[in-house]
From Swiss-Prot:
This is Cyclic GMP-binding protein D. Residues 353-582 form the Ras-GEF domain. A nucleoside 3',5'-cyclic phosphate 3 binds at residues 1182-1303. The keyword Nucleotide-binding applies. A nucleoside 3',5'-cyclic phosphate 2 binds at residues 1105-1218. Residues 26-155 form the N-terminal Ras-GEF domain. A nucleoside 3',5'-cyclic phosphate 1 binds at residues 698-857. Promotes the exchange of Ras-bound GDP by GTP. Induces the formation of substrate-attached pseudopodia, that leads to increased adhesion and thereby negatively influencing cell speed and polarity.
Length: 1312
C-alpha cells in the first residue's frame, strides 16, 4: 500500500493543539503540526483561509523548500492512489472539488514567491510544467501565463552597488545623492529611481545632475507621483490591525544580537561596510540607530556618488583608428555645484521653510519605502536587498546631513538656529506621520557630536525645547517604544504613514530568533511563529499600502536637499570637539570677565570687536559683552559702537595661555541677547540650502579696512615710466601696493645652446640626465629648435595689486625678477615690513588673512603658468623634436615619442598667439561679511566721537587706567585716543602722534606719553599689554617724526639708568623692564623670534623661515587625515576635477602631469584659448570646441606610451572604479589622462604636499598626479575639516598659510 501523507489521524506526531482553545477555531487553535497536516487543513475548508495562507508563505522557507510544497500540493490535488485505504478514497471523493480549487489558489500564491534560483532548478520547473499540462485547458492556460510572467519578473536577491574603491580619492565631499538600482518588480508607481539622483546607467544615458532621473518616463512618473496608489507584491492581510506587544528585556537581548552583527559587519570598526554574512541580522546602521539612538550618532553607510561624468556622444569617432593606445573620448566634466563662479561672486542662497523641507523629505522617503516588497523582509538577506539598503543609506545620510549642517556653522547662535530649524522639521514630519524622518533627525541631535554643543543648546527658545521634549517622548525607547507603538494604532487605513524601519527590522529579528520555526520536542512547524511574524509584517506594510500623500513634490526643494554636503562621521565628531572647545573657552572668558585688551582680533579680519559687538572689555570703554561687574553678561543693548556701560575693571586672564586667549577672541560670543535673536525670528526658521556654501574660513582677500591698518606706516612714491622699482639681485624688505598705473614683473630665464641641445636633434640615446626639465626650459628648448627668439615671460601688476610679497616669506632673499613701471606714471605705496610683523605678533587673524592672501596670489600665478602653457600648445606648423632627439616631427605640432620630462612640445609660444591676460584675484574683494560691516560701523562711531578724519581706523585697543579713571586706550594711524567714564560722564582725549615728544615706559605697567602740554600716564592691565601697545605706539610715532626706533630705545635705557641711581627704585625690576622693552622694540624692526619649525608635515626645506607650524601643530592638522595606499601607474588626481582635499605623501614618489590639450576646465575659464582652432566655428560650447584636425592626434602614437621614463604603461587595474563626484559610467581614473598629450612638470617625494591650489582656489585641479614609484602612501585631509580647524585656531592658521605661500612661491620660482 502506497503511503499517502494526508488523511492520517490527528495525534501528537503530526498535530498539537493549544490548551483550552476550541479546535473549531481553525489555525488559531493549532500550536504546531506537520507540513502535510498543515496543507491538509488549509485545503479542506470550503473557503480558503487567505490570511493564514499569506502568513504561511511569508516564512515557509525557514522550514521547507518550494519543491517539497509543490510535490505535496500535486499529491493533494490528484488524491490518494488507488491502493490507499477506503476511508481516504471516500473522504477525498467527498471534498475533491473544494480541495482542488484550494490547491490551485495556493499554487498561484506559491508562484508569486518563487525567485530566480527556484526557476533555475530543473526539477522544480519540470514538476510545475508537468502538473499544469495535466490540468483542463482553461485552467492550464491561466496558470501557465502566471508562471511565465512570474519567471520573467523574478530576479536574484538584489545586491547593493559595489562600494567605490577605497583607494580612489573622492573629488568632493559626499552629498545626499548616491547610486542604487530598483527592480521593476518592486518599483513603485512613484518612481523610486527618481528619489536619489546620481543613478548611473551602463550606457551613460543619465543626466549630469541625476535630478530628472534617467528617462522622460521617470520625469513623468515623478510629476504624477501622488496621483495613484501604491501596490506591493504582498499577500492579502487581514484588515484588522493590532499593535504588537513586546515583553520586557527584549531590547537587552537585541542589543547583544545587534552588537554581534555589527562586529561581523564592520570587523569591529566604524560603520561603512555592508558586506556582512549573517542572513538573519538586520543592517548595522539602522539597528544601531534603534538601540543606541540617544547615546551615539548612527553609524554611516555612505556611498560616495555625488556627481557624474558622461561621455559625449558627439565625440564617439575620436581616436577610432588607434587600436594600440588607450582611447579617450571627449569627457564633459561638469564642475560640482560647489564651485564658485570665476569672478568670485557667489550666487543667491536658497532658503525654504521647515514645512516645505519636511514635505519633500516625506515624498522622497515615501518613494523609497513603497518600493519595499515582502520578499525584501522575509528573505532576511537585508544586506543584499537593494530596497532596504536604499532606506538604510538614506536614513544615515539624513542623520549625517543634520550633523553636518549644524557643525558647519561657526557660532553658537548660528548653530542654535539650525538646531531649531531641524526640530521644527521633525515636528512637521511628525504631523505628516513620517516617523522615520523624525528618528533620523532625533538620532543626529542626540548623537555625541551635537549633544555636546551645550552653548548652542542653551540658546534654544522655550517653545523649541518644549517641542523637542514632545518629540523625544514620542520616540523614546522606554517601554520598547511604547508611545510610538501606541500612536501607530491610531493611524487610519487610508491615511499614509512612513513607519520607522529600524524598529520594524528589530522586531522582525527578535520574533525570528526568539521563536524557532520548528518545535524543539516534536520537530513540528511552529504555527504561533507564523502568526506572530505575519501580524507584525501586516502592521508595517498596511501603514503605507493603498494610500498616498496628497501634496506634490517641489523640485527646487528636492534639488537643494540632494545637493547638500554630508561629512564623514569621524570628522564630524572631531569638528564638534573643536566647536565645543571654542565655545567653552568663550564661556570661560565671559565668566572671568576677560575683555579684549590683549588682542583685538576676532572673526574674519584683524581687529577690534567680537562678533557680538563687544570690544575692549568691561571698563568704561569696554565692549558690551562684559558689564561693570565683570560677570560676562551684556547690557542687553545693541551697542553697534562696541561700547559698554561699566565703571570698573573686569577680571584678568590668569590661567589661560596666549593661544587660548587668541582662540577665545577669535570665536564668537555665545551670549547673544534674547532681543537680538528675536530680531531674526522671521528668517531663522528658513534654512539656507547651499550644498556648496563655503565654510566659515579665513578670508582669502584683505578688506579695505585691513589695508588701512597694514599701511599705517607706509609711504607713497611716484615713479615715471620705465623706472626700475626693484631689480634682479636686489634685496627687498618691503611690500608694494599699486595705487595707480601698473608695473611689469619680468621673469627672464635664459638657456644656453648646450642646454637646449640636450633636447634637440643630437644624441640618439636620449639620455638627458643633467638637463633642466622645468616647464619653461622645455618651452625654451622648443623655441630654439624652431629658430624662434627667446621670449621673456612676465606678467603685469595692476592697480590695487601687490608685489614684493616674497619679502614676508624669506629673509634677505635677492630678487629673481625686475619690477619696471609700465605706465605713464605709477603711484606705489611702500608698506613697512617691520611694523606689519610687529602687528602680526599679536594679530594672528590678520596675519592668517594676509598669508592666505599671498598664497592665493601665488596659486593663481602658478595656475596661469599651467593654463598659458596649455593654450599655446599645437599652434606651430612644424613638428618639434622627438623625445629621443630624432626630430621626427608631425603636423599636429606635438612630438611623436613617449612622454618623458624632455618631450618635445612643439611651438609652444608662437609669436602670432596672444598671451592670456590672466587677471589675478588680488583686486577682487569678497562681499563684506556682517562682521566687516559691524566693524566699519564701529570705526565710524569712533571717528565721530573723537572728531577724526575718515581714514582713521582702530588698530589696537587696550583696557587701562588714566587719571584714576578706567577706560580704553585706542591706537589709530595718527592718534592715541582714550575713552573713559567718570561719575557717569564720558571723558574723551586725543593725543596726535605728530605732537608727541616721546613715549616711554616706567614701573607698574605704566606708559608715559609726553606732549608739549604735559605728561600723560596710562596704566595697562598686564606687562604683555604694555609691551605690545608700547611697541606698536613707538613704531607709529617714530614713523610720523622720522625717528629711528633704536634711538627711542636708547632714550628709554638712559632714563632707566637715571632712575637706578635713586635708592627708592628696585634695580632688578627695572632691568627686567628694560629687557622687556628692548625685546619689544627690537621685535618691531625684525621678524619675531619664533623657533624654527621641524621638518614635519612637509617635504620642502624651509629651515631658514620662521613662524611655520611646529611638530605639535602639524600633529593637530594631521589628526583629520586618512591614510591610503596606491600602486604604480594609478592616478590620484585628475586634471579638471575639483578635489576639496589636501594630501601629503608619506612614502613613495608621484609625478605632476600636465595635459598639453586644453581640459574642459581650461575651456570654461579661458574660452579664448581655442579660438585659433582649424574649425573656426562660432559656437560657445566649450565641451565640443576641439577642432576636427585634432581627432586623429592619437593615431600616430606608439604602442603603450607611458608618462614614465622606464616606459611602464599606465596601470588599468582600477578600470571599473569611479571617482566620486567626477567620473561614472564605467570610466576609470586612468582614462582621464592621455599619455600621448601630457608632460611631466615635476616630481613630488616623501613629505611633499599637493592639492594646495584647489584648497586656495575654486575650480578643478590644474594638473594630474600619477604614482611613479612602486607604491605610494598618502594622508588625505578634508578641506572642510581644515577650514574649521584653522578658523578656530588663528595662531595656527597664520603659520599654515605662510607655509602654503612658501610652497607655492617655490614652485612658481622653479617654473619661471
Amino acid at each position: 500500500m502506497t503511503d499517502y501523507p494526508f488523511y492520517k489521524p490527528d495525534d501528537e506526531t503530526n498535530i498539537i493543539y493549544n490548551i483550552n482553545i476550541n479546535k473549531k477555531e481553525g489555525f488559531s487553535a493549532i500550536k504546531s503540526c506537520s507540513l502535510a497536516k498543515l496543507i491538509e487543513k488549509l485545503t479542506s475548508t470550503k473557503q480558503l483561509h487567505t490570511y493564514f495562507s499569506s502568513a504561511f508563505f511569508l516564512t515557509y522557507r525557514d522550514f521547507t523548500t518550494p519543491l517539497e510544497i509543490i510535490n505535496l500540493l500535486i499529491s493533494r490535488y490528484t488524491g490518494p492512489p488507488p491502493d490507499s485505504s477506503k476511508d481516504s478514497l471516500r473522504l477525498f471523493e467527498i471534498e475533491v472539488d473544494i480541495v482542488q480549487a484550494n490547491v490551485l489558489s495556493i499554487f498561484r500564491t506559491l508562484i508569486g514567491t518563487l525567485i530566480q534560483v527556484d526557476f533555475d532548478t530543473p526539477k522544480l520547473s519540470s514538476s510545475i510544467i508537468e502538473f499544469f499540462n495535466s490540468l483542463p485547458e482553461s485552467v492550464k492556460n491561466e496558470l501557465f501565463l502566471e508562471f511565465f510572467k512570474a519567471k520573467k519578473m523574478a530576479r536574484p536577491p538584489g545586491s547593493i552597488p559595489k562600494p567605490v574603491n577605497s583607494n580612489i580619492i573622492s573629488s568632493a565631499a559626499s552629498t545626499m545623492r548616491f547610486s542604487y538600482s530598483v527592480s521593476p518588480k518592486t518599483q513603485s508607481p512613484n518612481s523610486t529611481n527618481n528619489v536619489l539622483s546620481g543613478l548611473l546607467s551602463n550606457n551613460g544615458s543619465n543626466t549630469m545632475n541625476g535630478i530628472n532621473g534617467t528617462s522622460n518616463n521617470n520625469v513623468n512618473s515623478n510629476n504624477n507621483n501622488n496621483n495613484g496608489t501604491t501596490n506591493i507584491s504582498s499577500p492579502n492581510f487581514d484588515p484588522s490591525r493590532s499593535s504588537m506587544k513586546m515583553g520586557k528585556g527584549i531590547m537587552k537581548l537585541l542589543q547583544s544580537n545587534i552588537a554581534n552583527f555589527n562586529n561581523q559587519q564592520n570587523g569591529g570598526g566604524g560603520g561603512g561596510s555592508n558586506n556582512g554574512t549573517s542572513p538573519q541580522s538586520s543592517p548595522s546602521s539602522t539597528l544601531s540607530s534603534t538601540n543606541s539612538l540617544f547615546n551615539q550618532q548612527p553609524s554611516l553607510s555612505m556611498l560616495n556618488d555625488d556627481g557624474s561624468v558622461q561621455n559625449n556622444n558627439n565625440n564617439n569617432n575620436n581616436n577610432n583608428n588607434n587600436n594600440n593606445v588607450n582611447e579617450i573620448s571627449t569627457i564633459n566634466v561638469q564642475l560640482p555645484p560647489s564651485t564658485p563662479p570665476i569672478n568670485g561672486i557667489p550666487g543667491e542662497k536658497t532658503a525654504f521653510l521647515p514645512e516645505a523641507i519636511a514635505k519633500e523629505l516625506t515624498i522622497m522617503e515615501w518613494e523609497l519605502i513603497t518600493a519595499l516588497s515582502v520578499s525584501d523582509i522575509t528573505s532576511k538577506e537585508w544586506n543584499k536587498s537593494v530596497n532596504i539598503q536604499n532606506l538604510t543609506t538614506w536614513f544615515n545620510r539624513i542623520s549625517s546631513w543634520v550633523s553636518t549642517k549644524i557643525i558647519s556653522k561657526e557660532t553658537p547662535e548660528e548653530r542654535a538656529i539650525i538646531i531649531e530649524a531641524f526640530i521644527n522639521i521633525a515636528n512637521f514630519a511628525k504631523e505628516l506621520k513620517n516617523y522615520n524622518c523624525v528618528m533620523e533627525i532625533l538620532g543626529s541631535l542626540h548623537g555625541s557630536s551635537i549633544s555636546r554643543l551645550k552653548s548652542s543648546w542653551a540658546l534654544l527658545s522655550q517653545k523649541t525645547n518644549d517641542m523637542f521634549q514632545i518629540l523625544n517622548n514620542l520616540m523614546t525607547t522606554d517601554g520598547n517604544f511604547k508611545n510610538y507603538r501606541k500612536i501607530l494604532t491610531t493611524v487610519l487605513p487610508n491615511e499614509p504613514c512612513i513607519p520607522y524601519l529600524g524598529l520594524f527590522l528589530t522586531d522582525y529579528t527578535y520574533l525570528d530568533e526568539s521563536n524557532p520555526s520548528l518545535s524543539t520536542d516534536s520537530n513540528l512547524i511552529n504555527i504561533d511563529r507564523i502568526f506572530l511574524i505575519s501580524t507584525r509584517v501586516q502592521e508595517f506594510f498596511q501603514l503605507f499600502t493603498n494610500c498616498n500623500y496628497t501634496f506634490i513634490s517641489n523640485m527646487s526643494v528636492r534639488d537643494a536637499i540632494l545637493g547638500e554636503k554630508v561629512w564623514d562621521e569621524n570628522e564630524i565628531f572631531r569638528l564638534s570637539k573643536i566647536r565645543e572647545e571654542t565655545s567653552s573657552l568663550q564661556s570661560l572668558k565671559e565668566s572671568n570677565g576677560i575683555g579684549n585688551s590683549n588682542s583685538t582680533s576676532g572673526g574674519s579680519s584683524s581687529s577690534l570687536v567680537n562678533k557680538d559687538g563687544s570690544g575692549g572689555g568691561g571698563g568704561s570703554g569696554g565692549g558690551g559683552s562684559v558689564n561693570s561687574k565683570g560677570d560676562g553678561k551684556g547690557d542687553g543693548k545693541d551697542n553697534r559702537d562696541g561700547r559698554g556701560d561699566g565703571n570698573s575693571n573686569c577680571g584678568n586672564g590668569s590661567g589661560i595661555s596666549s593661544k587660548d586667549k587668541d582662540l577665545l577672541l577669535s570665536s564668537s560670543s555665545s551670549a547673544a541677547s534674547h532681543t537680538v535673536r528675536r530680531k531674526n525670528f522671521v528668517t531663522k526658521y528658513r534654512m539656507s540650502f547651499t550644498g556648496n556654501d563655503p565654510l566659515p574660513s579665513v578670508s582669502s582677500t584683505l578688506s579695505e579696512r585691513e589695508w588701512k591698518i597694514l599701511t599705517t606706516n607706509s609711504k607713497t612714491i611716484i615713479y615715471p615710466r620705465g623706472k626700475t622699482v626693484l631689480s634682479v639681485g636686489e634685496t627687498n624688505t618691503n611690500i608694494y601696493r599699486v595705487i595707480s598705473g601698473r608695473v611689469k614683473v619680468e621673469t627672464l630665464k635664459s638657456f644656453n645652446s648646450s642646454d637646449a641641445d640636450l633636447g634637440a636633434g643630437g644624441g640618439g640615446g636620449g639620455d638627458n640626465r643633467g638637463e633642466d626639465n622645468s616647464l619653461m626650459a622645455i618651452k625654451a628648448r622648443n623655441r630654439l629648435s624652431l629658430n624662434l627668439p627667446a621670449q621673456d615671460d612676465g606678467y603685469y601688476v595692476e592697480e590695487g595689486e601687490i608685489f614684493g610679497q616674497e619679502s614676508f616669506l624669506y629673509t634677505d632673499r635677492p630678487m629673481l625678477s625686475n619690477i619696471i613701471v609700465d605706465s605713464g606714471e605709477c603711484e606705489l605705496m611702500e608698506i613697512e615690513k617691520s611694523f606689519v610683523l610687529q602687528l602680526f605678533a599679536s594679530e594672528h587673524q590678520l596675519s592668517a588673512t594676509f598669508y592666505k592672501f599671498i598664497g592665493v596670489i601665488q596659486a593663481q600665478l602658478l595656475k596661469s603658468i599651467y593654463i598659458n602653457f596649455t593654450s599655446n600648445y599645437g599652434n606651430g606648423g612644424s613638428g618639434g623634436s622627438g623625445s629621443n632627439g630624432n626630430g621626427g616631427g608631425s603636423s599636429n605640432g606635438a612630438g611623436g615619442g613617449g612622454l618623458s620630462s624632455s618631450v618635445s612640445i612643439g611651438n609652444l609660444n608662437s609669436p602670432n598667439i596672444n598671451r592670456i591676460d590672466f587677471k589675478r584675484r588680488s583686486t577682487i574683494f569678497e562681499t563684506p561679511s556682517s562682521l566687516d560691516i559691524l566693524r566699519d560701523g564701529n570705526d565710524s562711531s569712533f571717528r565721530t566721537k573723537f572728531g577724526l578724519s575718515q581714514d582713521e581706523v582702530i588698530i589696537k585697543r587696550y583696557q587701562c587706567k588714566h587719571n584714576n579713571m578706567n577706560g580704553t586706550l585706542y591706537i589709530t594711524k595718527h592718534n592715541l585716543c582714550f575713552e573713559g567714564k567718570f561719575l557717569g560722564i564720558n571723558k574723551n582725549k586725543t593725543i596726535p602722534f605728530d605732537r608727541t615728544d616721546k613715549i616711554l615706559t616706567v614701573d607698574k605697567n605704566i606708559m608715559t606719553v609726553t606732549t608739549k602740554e604735559k605728561v600723560k600716564k596710562f596704566t595697562f592691565k598686564s606687562h604683555d599689554d604694555l609691551n605690545e601697545g608700547y611697541g606698536i605706539s613707538v613704531q607709529i610715532w617714530a614713523n610720523h617724526l622720522n625717528i629711528n626706533v633704536k634711538q627711542q630705545l636708547q632714550l628709554q635705557q638712559q632714563q632707566l639708568q637715571q632712575q637706578q641711581q635713586q635708592p627708592s627704585q628696585q634695580p632688578s625690576q627695572q632691568q627686567s623692564q628694560s629687557s622687556q622693552l628692548q625685546q619689544s622694540v627690537s621685535a618691531s624692526s625684525t621678524t619675531p623670534p619664533v623657533p624654527n619649525s621641524p621638518k614635519v608635515g612637509r617635504g620642502e626645506s624651509f629651515s631658514n623661515i620662521k613662524d611655520l607650524p611646529s611638530k605639535d601643530e602639524w600633529n593637530q592638522i594631521l589628526k583629520g587625515t586618512k591614510p591610503l595606499t596606491f600602486k604604480k601607474g594609478e592616478i590620484l588626481i585628475c586634471e579638471g576635477v575639483e578635489y576639496q582635499k589636501m594630501f601629503q605623501i608619506v612614502k613613495g614618489e608621484c609625478s605632476v602631469v600636465k595635459s598639453l590639450l586644453p581640459t574642459p576646465l581650461d575651456q570654461n575659464i579661458f574660452n579664448n584659448i581655442n579660438n585659433n582652432n582649424n574649425n573656426n566655428n562660432n559656437n560657445n560650447n566649450n565641451n565640443n570646441n576641439n577642432n576636427n584636425n585634432n581627432n586623429n592626434n592619437n593615431n600616430n602614437g606608439n604602442n603603450n606610451n607611458s608618462i614614465f621614463k622606464n616606459n611602464s604603461s599606465i596601470s588599468n587595474t582600477n578600470s571599473n572604479t569611479s571617482i566620486d563626484g567626477g567620473v561614472g559610467g564605467g570610466l576609470s581614473p586612468q582614462t582621464l589622462v592621455d599619455p600621448k598629450n601630457s608632460v611631466i612638470v615635476s616630481k613630488l617625494t616623501h613629505g611633499s604636499i599637493f592639492g594646495e591650489m584647489s584648497f586656495l582656489l575654486p575650480g578643478g585641479s590644474a594638473t594630474s598626479l600619477v604614482v611613479s614609484s612602486d607604491e605610494v602612501e598618502v594622508y588625505i585631509i578634508e578641506s572642510y575639516f581644515l577650514h574649521i580647524l584653522l578658523k578656530s585656531k588663528p595662531y595656527l592658521a597664520s603659520k599654515f598659510y605662510k607655509y602654503l605661500a612658501c610652497v607655492l612661491e617655490t614652485r612658481v620660482r622653479n617654473l619661471t
